[in-house]
């Protein structure tokens, strides 16, 4: 029985090493104009919804009006109700755009995706100069907006101009205090 089990594990080795053809990678995301435009749409996907009461407390989280409909399918304002009652906390806050929890999306991932787009836009075949310039300007504006949103929510933040390589030294990952805009 032991020999049979040993042979069965060695027989699967080549089968498990096969990589499917349709796996999306960063390189394939910028091979055509259409796939690059889809990646640019990903950069837009992180924009906070200003009209959503769970993502914008300015709508209904004041003491003047409290709306809470437990069975309301269209608008559940439980988050804003708890915020108005003083139930916000520092360890796991509502509308956390830093980590992407409790109603907020992780805006540092959005900034990383914008940087990936800006690093790879030069490799797109068939993209005209005016359109390329417009796409670059749009993604830079999104990146600035995400930095502004984080600054507005948390105060001084590191400005992420470019993505840091995974094999970078620890010194390269440290942000000098003078680079943090106050």
What are these regions, as identified by a protein language model?
Residues 37, 45-49, 75-154, 170-176:
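Conserved, well-structured interaction surfaces
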